[in-house]
């Protein structure tokens, strides 16, 4: 493969059977036939080919095509999900806001309030929202996604002992610009998932996330902060180049989003 993946996402075969080839093309020799419901882990991919991935099956390595011949129907299901991205809106004055979400590498699953070709809300400076569809009140817009196929960048980040997770998140989220309330809601959601692990390899994603989960907001915000954490649990610590994080300055109409995903490995 052009790029080897150390912490690749898990997937299961959903086609009746899936051929594994010795190269990323059907002209190569078939190395194995993988039955339906088999659990696999992505080990690598080609930079210029989104249809083939490199996997291991029963000690053999090879390539599988993750789409049928129509290039739309998938042969596998990815188990990684985008968990609880929430969107806060802070206009300078009462404002009608339209928010659209475009997912190119995952499938929209649950939304609240209900997403109907976007969200239409009246937003207030304190962050409170009124959903125009039914008049319900909210603190944020919630969404999550399944079958996430995004290849997140795990080359830089932080290896953190599970027992140090709370301290780490408080420090980094404050530095990146979350308010105490936003930070507390982030930590309350993620801490129970992470602190019992021996270690966590933690990254905060940039373009890999923002380009695959695009936000279109009308009116356009003056400042936008999108924090998306991706982590994987480890039994032992690893050395990794520390990630340089950016700070965030709030000005004018401000939008803040946070969420995350765990790369689970069998």
Residue ranges and their predicted role:
Residues 11-13, 33, 48, 80-84, ...:
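Short, surface-exposed loop/turn motifs at beta-strand boundaries within globular domains
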Residues 24-29:
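Short alpha-helix capping/helix-loop boundary micro-motifs
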Residues 1, 32-69:
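SH3/SH3-like beta-barrel superfamily modules
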Residues 19-23:
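Core beta-strand residues in small-molecule sensory/regulatory alpha/beta domains
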Residues 2-9, 68-78:
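Intrinsically disordered, low-complexity Ser/Thr-rich linker and spacer segments
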Residues 77-266:
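Protease-labile, long low-complexity intrinsically disordered regions enriched in Pro/Ser/Thr
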Residues 18, 38, 53, 85-87, ...:
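Residue-level detector of short, conserved catalytic/binding motifs and their immediate flanks
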């Amino acid at each position: 493969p052009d790029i080897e993946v150390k912490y690749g996402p898990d997937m299961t075969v959903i086609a009746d059977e899936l051929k594994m080839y010795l190269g990323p093309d059907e002209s190569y020799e078939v190395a194995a036939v993988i039955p339906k419901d088999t659990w696999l882990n992505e080990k690598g991919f080609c930079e210029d080919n989104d249809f083939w991935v490199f996997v291991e099956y029963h000690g053999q390595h090879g390539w599988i095509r993750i789409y049928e011949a129509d290039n739309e129907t998938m042969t596998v299901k990815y188990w990684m999900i985008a968990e609880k991205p929430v969107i806060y809106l802070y206009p300078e004055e009462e404002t009608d806001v339209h928010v659209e979400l475009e997912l190119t590498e995952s499938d929209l699953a649950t939304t609240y309030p209900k997403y109907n070709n976007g969200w239409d809300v009246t937003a207030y400076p304190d962050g409170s929202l009124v959903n125009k569809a039914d008049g319900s009140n909210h603190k944020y817009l919630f969404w999550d996604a399944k079958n996430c196929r995004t290849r997140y960048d795990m080359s830089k980040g932080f290896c953190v002992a599970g027992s140090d997770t709370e301290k780490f998140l408080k420090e980094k989220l404050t530095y990146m610009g979350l308010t105490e309330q936003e930070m507390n809601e982030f930590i309350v959601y993620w801490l129970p998932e992470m602190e019992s692990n021996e270690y966590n390899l933690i990254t905060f994603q940039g373009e890999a996330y923002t380009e695959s989960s695009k936000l279109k907001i009308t009116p356009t915000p003056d400042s936008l902060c999108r924090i998306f954490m991706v982590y994987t649990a480890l039994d032992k610590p690893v050395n990794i180049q520390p990630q340089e994080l950016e700070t965030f300055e709030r000005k004018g109409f401000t939008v803040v989003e946070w969420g995350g995903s765990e790369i689970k490995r069998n």
